[in-house]
């Protein structure tokens, strides 16, 4: 006769803890933010290389040659851990050579790197030329330093002091808070330039009325070239693929290609008055997006309210204003200002440039419409279905899964609508 065995105690059962629910806002794959050197995904290869470097540093020094090699490996290891050190050394070297030379005029070869060139006499007007590329290149290095320094020295400790323990969240907060810092400066800077011009408030007729704009005011040129440096630096990080691509990697890459084409063509062919309003629409909306994401990562109760404001601003700036500019290409491009092709006088506002301008701005609008679709999907999930499943990138999912394998999960589920 078979005996019935008692069931094991519930204390011995392995209860699979329910993962903590996440909000969609912080991980929705949209926007212009590109991962940095300091937040890139650590692959097995990079971890193995780091172990090799540490082994070399632990080896005994037998002669001067070994000592030099150890110093070099020490510098490389520090630079890998703190990516802002190498660009800082370049900046210090150039600035030191420039200011200690006793010649801070345009005759100094370093002047074209540290300051804007082509000032017209003693006026506030600045022309354009090949030296502007030197300025853009140098400030690409500056933005590399600025981003890595702020994220490593300022934002990371700040996030830890706010009791953020997840390595993944700290990295995402670092990226978004730097975006808040940059767009929080560039957005008002661009609005200031627009306010002190005839472009206020997104006056489309003024974009064409004075064409060709061979010169720009000092602050206008600093803003324009600074933006070019910022976007070029981001594009380099994106091209190098230092981060595992997110789901909208192709759209993000396409967005950067179109943006850089717009920057280059508008500057070279004297359409800078068209570029300024587009810069502003991107910066202000990006500021609100990053602010909403940061509040979401910090589990703030204001995250949904902030996200709602962002959605309204995104639709107004990236769609209404940009479509208004796109419509002006069809209606005002021909009628306002000169409309003639003349290579001798650099007159390029003509029947050839019209479709090119329209296609580039239209391509930018298509990417923004795709991201708007993702935004509406998030709103639908939150408001109607209550589903908080993420549209996150592979890198984010993998990183969180790696983290969860080494850290205990919270067995008590928490509901977060935003």
Swiss-Prot record:
> So, what pathway does this thing act in?
Lipid metabolism; sphingolipid metabolism
Per the record, membrane topology reads: Multi-pass membrane protein
Q: How is it modified after translation?
A: Phosphorylated; phosphorylation is induced upon disruption of sphingolipid synthesis. Phosphorylation is inhibited by exogenous addition of phytosphingosine.
Residue stretches spanning the membrane: 82-102, 131-155, 173-194, 218-240, 250-268, 274-295, 306-334, 354-382
Q: Does Nucleotide-binding count among this protein's keywords? A: no
Outcome recorded upon mutating residue 172 to A: Abolishes the enzymatic activity of the ceramide synthase complex. Does not rescue the growth defect of LAC1-LAG1 double deletion mutant
Tell me where in this chain the PTM Phosphoserine is found: 23-24
Q: What are the TLC domain coordinates in residue numbering?
A: 168-385
Description of activity control: As part of the ceramide synthase complex, inhibited by the sphinganine analog mycotoxin, fumonisin B1 (FB1). Activated by ACB1, as part of the ceramide synthase complex.
Under InterPro entries, the record lists: Lag1/Lac1-like, TLC-dom
What effect on the protein does mutating residue 389 to A have, as reported in its record?
Reduces the in vitro activity of LAC1-LIP1 complex in the presence of ACB1, increases the levels of phytosphingosine in vivo and does not rescue the growth defect of LAC1-LAG1 double deletion mutant
The UniProt catalytic activity note for this protein reads: a very long-chain fatty acyl-CoA + a sphingoid base = an N-(very-long-chain fatty acyl)-sphingoid base + CoA + H(+); hexacosanoyl-CoA + sphinganine = N-hexacosanoylsphinganine + CoA + H(+); eicosanoyl-CoA + sphinganine = N-eicosanoylsphinganine + CoA + H(+); a fatty acyl-CoA + sphinganine = an N-acylsphinganine + CoA + H(+)
**Signal peptide residues on this chain, from the entry's feature table:** none
Annotated Basic residues bias: 15-24
The record places the following residue ranges in the Cytoplasmic compartment, namely 2-81, 156-172, 241-249, 296-305, 383-418
> Which residues hold fumonisin B1?
169, 172, 182, 231, 255, 286, 289, 293, 296-297, 303-304, 307, 314, 371, 375, 378, 382, 385
Q: What happens when the gene is disrupted?
A: Does not affect the level of total sphingolipids. Exhibits weak diffusion barriers only in cortical ER and not in the nuclear envelope. Double knockout of LAC1 and LAG1 abolishes growth and leads to mating defects including defects in diploid cell formation, pheromone-induced shmoo formation, induction of cell cycle arrest and activation of mating-specific MAP kinase. Also defective in the localization of STE5 to the plasma membrane.
Other remarks in the entry: Present with 2840 molecules/cell in log phase SD medium.
Protein name in UniProt: Ceramide synthase LAC1
């Amino acid at each position: 006769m078979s005996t019935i065995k008692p069931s094991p105690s519930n204390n011995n059962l392995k209860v699979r803890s329910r993962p903590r629910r996440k909000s969609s806002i912080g991980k929705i794959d949209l926007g212009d933010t590109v991962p940095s050197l300091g937040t890139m995904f650590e692959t097995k290869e990079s971890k193995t290389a780091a172990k090799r470097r540490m082994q070399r540093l632990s080896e005994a020094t037998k002669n001067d040659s070994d000592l030099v090699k150890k110093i070099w490996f020490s510098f490389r290891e520090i630079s890998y851990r703190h990516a802002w050190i190498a660009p800082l050394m370049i900046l210090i070297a150039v600035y030191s050579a420039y200011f200690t030379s006793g010649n801070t005029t345009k005759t100094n070869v370093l002047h074209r790197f540290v300051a804007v060139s082509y000032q017209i006499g003693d006026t506030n007007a600045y022309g354009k030329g090949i030296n502007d590329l030197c300025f853009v290149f140098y400030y690409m290095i500056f933005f590399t330093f600025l981003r890595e320094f702020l994220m490593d020295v300022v934002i990371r400790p700040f996030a830890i002091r706010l009791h953020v323990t997840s390595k993944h969240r700290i990295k995402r907060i670092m990226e978004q808070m730097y975006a808040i810092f940059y767009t929080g400066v560039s957005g008002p800077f661009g609005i200031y330039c627009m306010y002190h011009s005839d472009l206020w408030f997104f006056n489309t007729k003024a974009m064409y009325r004075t064409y060709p704009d061979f010169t720009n005011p000092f602050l206008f040129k600093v803003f324009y070239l600074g933006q070019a440096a910022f976007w070029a630096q981001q594009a380099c990080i994106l091209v190098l693929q230092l981060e595992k691509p997110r789901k909208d990697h192709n759209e993000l890459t396409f967005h950067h290609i179109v943006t850089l084409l717009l920057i280059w063509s508008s500057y070279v062919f004297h359409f800078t008055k068209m570029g300024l309003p587009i810069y502003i629409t991107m910066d202000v909306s990006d500021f609100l997006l990053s602010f909403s994401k940061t509040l979401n990562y910090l589990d703030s109760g204001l995250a949904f309210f902030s996200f709602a404001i962002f959605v309204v601003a995104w639709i107004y700036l990236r769609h209404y204003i940009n479509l208004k500019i796109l419509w002006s290409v069809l209606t005002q491009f021909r009628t306002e200002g000169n409309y003639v092709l003349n290579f001798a006088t650099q007159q390029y506002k003509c029947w050839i440039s019209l479709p090119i301008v329209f296609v580039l701005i239209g391509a930018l609008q298509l990417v923004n419409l795709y991201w708007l679709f993702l935004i509406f999907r998030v709103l639908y999930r939150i408001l109607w279905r209550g589903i908080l499943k993420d549209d996150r990138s592979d890198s984010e999912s993998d990183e969180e899964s790696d983290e969860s394998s080494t850290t205990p999960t919270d067995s008590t589920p928490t509901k977060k609508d935003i």
